[in-house]
Amino acid sequence: MKKLSTGISNFREIIENDYIYVDKTKTIYELIDDNFTCMLVKPKGFGKSLLISTMKEIFEGNKELFKGLYIYDKWDWTNKYNVIHLDFKKINYETPEKLEQSLYDFLVKIADKYEIELWGTLLNSNFSFLIEDIHKKTDKKVVVLIDGYDKPTIDSIENIELAKEILSDLFSFFTVLKASGKHLKFVFLTGVTKSFETSIFSGFNNVFDLTTHYQYPNICGFTQDEFESYYFEYINKFSKDKNIETRKLIDLINRWYGGYSWNGKDFLINPKSAFSFISTAKFDNYWFENSKTPFLIDLIKNNQEEVEELIQNKQTYVSDINNLEIERIDVNQFLLQNGFLSLKKEKRAKSLQTYYEVYIPNREVKKSLNEIIAK
């Protein structure tokens, strides 16, 4: 059996070490072939970092890594692009000053790679200059991949003033991308939540949000068909070892770790939880341990009545699935964007206002919420 890629988000490492890779390159090919500036919001553990890593290898023209995958004989591998890959997990954002310095240090590393000298210490000017100069020096446009664009703001949200200051700095930094359009081939940003999206992306034109778009519902996460196909040997082994029918086992996996939807039609299994289950052969709560924060726990406890209604499967609605107000967080909206709730259906009131019915997707999430409330 091929190995499980638990915790690995580097595409090259997965391929070169013969780990299982669920082929998402058909969807990636369709996305990058037709769009310019895109964003994707999904909860932790759904494979956003792996998606960006895969895109990086495609744009850099590393064809040999894609042998046997959909994109192998579709993409024009003679076109190679310069990739700037910014991962906010590797950026220090404890204070606005540390955020600015860490981003500047990141730009210096990119500049050194292309033997480009930055001008002074102005962050945004240097970012703009760097993109332009890489294009001019190599005669190839630049691809910018940003992983966790919202992480500095979300992780600072317990301190509203700090979060607002960091948000302002990020807005200025990201605005450079709009001004650099003629030097760019493709821009892709991922995050955990659409919180404050309006502020961050108000400087952009035509940002394509594929989070709920009908063409790309399965770009992250596993469909049931994908899970059954790629992990059949593991499922079959567990089924025999535990003396449980395969179909019943798959149904249990869905009840525990599936049920995620961002359009009410296509449903996904949480990859991190599914990996952990296969590795341990035990139904348990895996995903939440890496998703909980003090802010989230306090938010749930401070809105215990609403959360208990969710746990009791009462109908619950969210009027806006996109933009959170930084100074007034709606608990259901925040839970939806962070993977604790899922979209059931979109509805329209008599006033024609759109609202959304939401629900707890699976046993793992319900168990997590119960544990928080019980403490």
Report each predicted region and the residues it spans.
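Phosphate-binding site recognition
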Residues: 1-375
